[in-house]
Structure formats: structure tokens, C-alpha cells
């Protein structure tokens, strides 16, 4: 039996500052894992890009304790899930889809985005 992993879209209440945003899409399994990681300690997730590899970037998620955001950050949220994004990276992170998948014995977050043009040969980085 196949089970389709439904998505929710996180939006920002700051849409008046940022025009034409698509939001951040997360699957139900990603939502469940993010809530598991953040609820107990009331942390939030910060999504960012890290320069690395042969192609240029990779996605990074980190837990942040300080919930006060500064003017250079935007919070996307829906259904008890919050993800913080730096405004300098918004044009590259807006529209990303986050999933939490099992590959062999390991579980990990997987990211997909229509703006990605190329992946490096090893698959560890990409370019827009």
C-alpha cells in the first residue's frame, strides 16, 4: 500500500515586506520530525544555505534557542511549526520543499526546489 506524504505550506505574516513569496513546503513526516526536535525545548528551526562542495550550496537546518528574530530574519509558520529564514537568502529558499525520509537504516531531511539548476557529481551541493 502506498501512502502519499501530504504537504503543508508555511507562510510568513510579514508578507507585506516580501512580495510574491511561495512559502516553505513541508511534508507530514518532516512536520512530525521538526515538532519532535523543537517542542520539548521550545526551539525553532533556522533554514539556511551553506557554501560548500563543487556546485556551490547545500541546505542546513539548525535549532535556535533565541526566538527573538532580528530585522534580517523572516519566520514562516503553520500548524505549530516555525522556520526562520535570513532575508538575504529568501530568494533562494522561498518555495523549497522539505521531507523527512528513510534511506536504508538512516533517516534524514531531504530538500527539493524548482530553482536548482545543477547538482555536483557527488550530490552534496547544488547551484541555482
From Swiss-Prot:
Molecular function GO terms recorded: 2 iron, 2 sulfur cluster binding
Superkingdom in the source lineage: Bacteria
Gene Ontology biological-process entries: iron-sulfur cluster assembly
Classification via Gene3D superfamilies: HesB-like domain
Alphabetical list of InterPro entries matching this protein: Fe-S_cluster_asmbl/transfer, FeS_biogenesis, FeS_cluster_insertion, FeS_cluster_insertion_CS, HesB-like_dom_sf
Family: Belongs to the HesB/IscA family.
PANTHER family the UniProt entry points to: IRON-SULFUR CLUSTER ASSEMBLY 1 HOMOLOG, MITOCHONDRIAL (PTHR10072:SF41), IRON-SULFUR CLUSTER ASSEMBLY PROTEIN (PTHR10072)
Name of the protein described by the UniProt record: Uncharacterized protein bbp_116
UniProt source species: Buchnera aphidicola subsp. Baizongia pistaciae (strain Bp)
Amino acid at each position: 500500500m502506498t501512502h502519499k506524504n501530504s504537504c503543508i505550506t508555511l507562510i510568513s505574516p510579514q508578507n507585506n515586506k516580501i512580495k510574491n513569496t511561495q512559502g516553505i513546503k513541508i511534508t507530514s513526516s518532516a512536520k512530525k520530525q521538526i515538532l519532535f526536535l523543537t517542542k520539548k525545548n521550545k526551539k525553532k528551526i533556522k533554514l539556511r544555505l551553506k557554501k560548500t562542495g563543487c556546485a556551490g550550496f547545500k541546505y542546513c537546518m539548525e535549532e535556535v534557542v533565541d526566538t527573538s528574530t532580528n530585522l534580517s530574519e523572516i519566520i514562516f509558520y503553520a500548524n505549530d511549526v516555525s522556520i526562520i529564514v535570513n532575508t538575504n537568502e529568501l530568494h533562494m529558499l522561498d518555495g523549497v520543499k522539505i521531507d523527512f525520509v528513510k534511506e536504508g537504516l538512516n533517516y534524514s531531511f531531504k530538500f527539493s526546489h524548482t530553482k536548482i539548476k545543477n547538482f555536483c557529481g557527488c550530490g552534496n551541493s547544488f547551484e541555482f
